[in-house]
């Protein structure tokens, strides 16, 4: 067990994670006394705490996370908010089932804070960081699914290249994939630093804005956790769970996530989905969301200085409308 994991067990409320775009998230969620809210990605708990304080004395939060360490943190925090914070171990791909199992429907607001928490990134045993030596794992839930090492050591060069290009937008995808396949023929690739060194070798001595392994690690993490599929499922279910007037807020950290969220919001806010040029609407589509953020909200320079992790964050928000358009 890593030192960080041991400390987390001794003090579940200890965290290095600072919630991103907290003020904007609260503004768009607009928590109120007696409201019911879902934090679909509890993480360090910063957003949930703020929602609980803003919805005092009787607002409730269903705190969902796939990471058992985050759920332990939520259970510890729940003792400070008896009857108001409901910890839940699960993936937001099952959002509707989880909410219904708690009788937590309909709801007044749902927050998705996507990507990694600082605690996950800082724990070498989790295998998310290319700067810290650890096993090639990358699972949000270490008790479920296969680690990244399985992909790295069993997928073909063609499959790896497609993965790095599709989920990492990595321009050197094919060269990196070939290098991985050649290296694993000599010895298994089992650690984060081992993989990062291989990728850096392909990049050579060129100086880049980001570490050469950034995109490869992103692609592997997305694949291991099926993040985009989970996000698409979670967003679709979130709309169903919201009462009219309820708010949906999503914070994304890379272009693939943000693009998916933007397209989903636009589709759900559109009055018609017929192909351009169709003389009369025949699709029967009725909008279910009203956009609150025509453009994504970005962190201020001050927040980026204080919390560099927030640099790539993009927040989008929408409001559930009734079928009659109100």
UniProtKB/Swiss-Prot annotation:
Keyword NADP: no
One GO term describing the cellular component: cytoplasm
Biased composition (Basic and acidic residues): 316-326
SUPFAM superfamilies: Putative methyltransferase TM0872, insert domain, S-adenosyl-L-methionine-dependent methyltransferases
GO biological process: rRNA base methylation
Superkingdom: Bacteria
Main location: cytoplasm
GO molecular function terms noted in the UniProt entry: rRNA (cytosine-N4-)-methyltransferase activity
Region annotation Disordered: where it falls in the sequence: 299-326
Signal sequence interval, chain numbering: none
EC number per UniProt: 2.1.1.199
Binding site for S-adenosyl-L-methionine: 45-47, 65, 113, 120
Subcellular location: Cytoplasm
Catalytic activity, reaction form: cytidine(1402) in 16S rRNA + S-adenosyl-L-methionine = N(4)-methylcytidine(1402) in 16S rRNA + S-adenosyl-L-homocysteine + H(+)
InterPro entries found in the cross-reference section: RsmH (IPR002903), SAM-dep_MeTrfase_MraW_recog (IPR023397), SAM-dependent_MTases_sf (IPR029063)
Keyword list, A-Z: Cytoplasm, Methyltransferase, rRNA processing, S-adenosyl-L-methionine, Transferase
Record-stated family: Belongs to the methyltransferase superfamily. RsmH family.
Reported function: Specifically methylates the N4 position of cytidine in position 1402 (C1402) of 16S rRNA.
PANTHER family to which the protein is assigned, alphabetical: 12S RRNA N4-METHYLCYTIDINE METHYLTRANSFERASE (PTHR11265:SF0), S-ADENOSYL-METHYLTRANSFERASE MRAW (PTHR11265)
Protein name per its UniProtKB record: Ribosomal RNA small subunit methyltransferase H
Taxonomic classification: Bacteria, Pseudomonadati, Thermomicrobiota, Thermomicrobia, Thermomicrobiales
């Amino acid at each position: 067990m890593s030192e960080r994991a041991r400390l987390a067990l001794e003090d579940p409320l200890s965290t290095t994670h600072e919630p991103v775009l907290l003020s904007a998230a609260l503004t768009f969620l607009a928590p109120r006394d007696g409201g019911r809210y879902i934090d679909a990605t509890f993480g360090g708990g910063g957003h949930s705490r703020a929602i609980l304080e803003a919805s005092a004395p009787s607002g409730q939060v269903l705190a969902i996370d796939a990471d058992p360490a985050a759920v332990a943190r939520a259970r510890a925090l729940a003792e400070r908010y008896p009857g108001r914070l409901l910890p839940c171990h699960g993936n937001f791909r099952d959002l509707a089932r989880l909410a219904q199992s708690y009788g937590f429907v309909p709801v007044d607001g749902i927050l998705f804070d996507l990507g990694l928490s600082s605690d996950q990134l800082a724990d070498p045993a989790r295998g998310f960081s290319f700067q810290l030596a650890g096993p090639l794992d990358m699972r949000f839930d270490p008790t479920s699914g296969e680690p990244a090492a399985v992909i790295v050591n069993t997928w073909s060069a063609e499959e790896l290249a497609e993965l790095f290009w599709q989920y990492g937008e990595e321009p050197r995808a094919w060269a990196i994939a070939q290098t991985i396949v050649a290296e694993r023929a000599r010895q298994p690739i089992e650690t984060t630093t081992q993989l990062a060194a291989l990728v850096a070798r392909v990049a050579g001595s060129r100086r880049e804005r980001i570490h050469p392994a950034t995109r490869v690690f992103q692609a592997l993490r997305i694949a291991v956790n099926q993040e985009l599929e989970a996000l698409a499922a979670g967003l679709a279910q979130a709309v169903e769970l919201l009462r009219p007037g309820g708010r949906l807020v999503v914070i994304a950290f890379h272009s693939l996530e943000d693009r998916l969220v933007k397209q989903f919001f636009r589709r759900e806010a559109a009055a018609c989905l017929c192909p351009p040029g169709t003389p009369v609407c025949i699709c029967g589509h009725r909008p279910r969301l009203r956009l609150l953020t025509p453009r994504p909200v970005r962190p201020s320079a001050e927040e980026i200085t204080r919390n560099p992790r927030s640099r790539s964050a993009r927040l989008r928000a929408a409001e559930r409308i009734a079928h009659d358009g109100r």
